[in-house]
Design a protein with these regions (language model features):
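A conserved regulatory-domain signal marking ACT and ACT-like small-molecule sensing domains
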Residues: 1-89
Length: 89
């Protein structure tokens, strides 16, 4: 099972580090990561394997929501089922 984590906001030191820390905390394996800096805007898309995750998916989303608030960024965690359903419509 996989999930996609997206991060968008004003660039600042430590974004990748903080997102990675939460991935480690919940045993999410980063399989692919892409980041771009456009002027002062930071964007990142991360594909993670959640097969070995600790806790529930809701708890992971809540932790990333807290990080989003703390850093003043938009961070979304979306389960692969969402993307699979979009292709079935």
């Amino acid at each position: 099972m996989k999930a996609v984590i997206t991060v968008i906001g004003t660039d600042q030191v430590g974004i990748v580090h903080r997102v990675s820390e939460l991935c480690v905390k919940h045993q999410l394996n980063i399989e692919d990561i892409s980041q771009t800096l456009m002027d002062s805007y930071f964007t990142m898309i991360t594909l993670v394997n959640i097969s070995q995750m600790t806790g529930t998916f809701s708890e992971i989303v809540e932790d990333f929501d807290r990080l989003s608030d703390e850093l003043g960024l938009t961070i979304r965690v979306q389960h692969e089922d969402l993307f699979n359903q979009m292709h079935n419509v």
